[in-house]
From Swiss-Prot:
UniProt-recorded name of the protein: Ribosomal RNA small subunit methyltransferase H
Entry's EC annotation: 2.1.1.199
Keywords of this entry: Cytoplasm, Methyltransferase, rRNA processing, S-adenosyl-L-methionine, Transferase
Function field: Specifically methylates the N4 position of cytidine in position 1402 (C1402) of 16S rRNA.
GO biological process, one term: rRNA base methylation
Residues noted as binding S-adenosyl-L-methionine in the record, renumbered to the chain: G34, G35, H36, D59, F86, D112, Q119
Amino acid sequence: MEHDGYHLPVMVSEVTDLLARRPGIYIDGTLGGGGHAFSVMSALRRSGFENDSLLIGIDQDSFALEEAAGRLRPFASRVRLERGNFSEMAAIIERIRLREGCRLPVMGILLDLGVSSFQIDTPDRGFSYLRQGPLDMRMDPDGGWSAADIVNTAEESELAGIIYRYGEEKKSRAIARAIKARVREKGDFRETAELAAVVRSVVAGHDRQIKSLSRVFQALRIAVNDELGVLESALEDGTACLAPSGRMGVMSYHSLEDRMVKRFFRDKSEDDWGPKGVGLREPLRSAGFKLVTRKSVVASDDEVRINPRARSARLRVIEKKELEGESHDRVYQ
């Protein structure tokens, strides 16, 4: 698939094959440069479903929305772009339905988690220890606390907890201690390079330094953007929005997210048999969903060679079951 300077989307064919199956509303909650959205709309057009479908693209980043608008121009009449967080998708869907009188069912939702290559490679965003820039890390450049705010104001124990919990970094206490000592001695952190230097001073060996830097920057990014809390809300709201036979796909890039998605999808797809030992003949509640992917889908070796970012990606998909008397053709308001 052709791509532009924003970023090369991961597992495009797999996402499209698993999600773009029927006419309806499709949500790309992490629109980015619009690569996945373009592929989904292209597939719907080839299947003759374009005129009976609507794609809603959501992103916090106004630059991403501008990039995606250009890419999705061939489908402009069937695309709506909204600035916001994907945890707000239920409200966004309802707003568009009311505004346009749209009664199509929600048949597909995609969340491609993590930071885009464009954001990582843009120094002013402060996501990478490889790029000199302000220590920011906000997905929404206009809102909330930055990473600098956290490292400068958090107590040492709180900072250590963030680094350990969200980065799974074993030297979290030593790194937090060094960060707060640096604040006391030299003042507030402002640049990514300043934080990177402190981490390197604590961790010995180049390879270990690189791993610790990745973990510390990941931990701060997750904390700044409340990524796990946002994901939890989005999983609940997204599955609630789906019509029968509708599917939700989530692509994660680190173990914290993947474990959360795996656990949530498993719980949604299992019958409720009540407390252990009761010995019920029938479940108290039948599962309303089924797993489409029993194991996570990973990128092919060929794709990883072309796009190394795909190496850590894990895609999981769940489908809402059709209850007796229900159909995906039912109209939802």
